[in-house]
């Protein structure tokens, strides 16, 4: 048992959390502590930044929130903490709703995809400007090109 928890994979962590949604499982990772998926959802009222990572080994996005030990100590107050080797569990103050969790999960992923598309548009715009053959174009062609860029930016 001791050895198993020293080498927990991300699959082990999300499975442990999924099996008991009355608790928030918090895992020590380096100097920070993380809660995954349902655990992050149960702490959503704290407004921590949610990180999303696609994990190839489980072919899915995993949502997590991370925080230092000082935050963990505050979270432990009034939550009946149970300590284990590399993680702890805290009693949740709210009742878990699968429907609300799935809605929150999808919203988090949609928000990241919107941010990624903004970055892609900015990158595409910079790339377009960088690669435009200004020296080989007439002033009228340059004017038309700038007008198209303005239209693209104003969308």
List PLM regions with ranges.
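Basic, polar low-complexity surface loops/patches
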Residues: 4-155
């Amino acid at each position: 048992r001791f050895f198993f928890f020293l080498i927990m994979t991300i699959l082990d962590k999300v499975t442990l959390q999924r099996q008991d949604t009355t608790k928030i499982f918090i895992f020590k990772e380096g100097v920070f502590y993380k809660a995954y998926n349902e655990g992050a959802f149960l702490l959503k009222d704290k407004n921590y930044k949610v990180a999303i990572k696609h994990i190839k080994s489980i072919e899915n996005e995993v949502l997590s929130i991370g925080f230092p030990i000082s935050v963990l100590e505050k979270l432990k107050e009034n939550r009946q903490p149970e300590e284990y080797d590399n993680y702890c569990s805290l009693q949740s103050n709210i009742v878990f709703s699968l429907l609300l969790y799935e809605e929150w999960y999808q919203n988090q992923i949609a928000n990241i995809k919107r941010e990624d598309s903004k970055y892609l548009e900015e990158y595409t715009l910079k790339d377009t400007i960088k690669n435009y053959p200004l020296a080989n174009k007439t002033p009228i062609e340059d004017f038309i090109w700038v007008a198209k860029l303005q239209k693209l930016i104003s969308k």
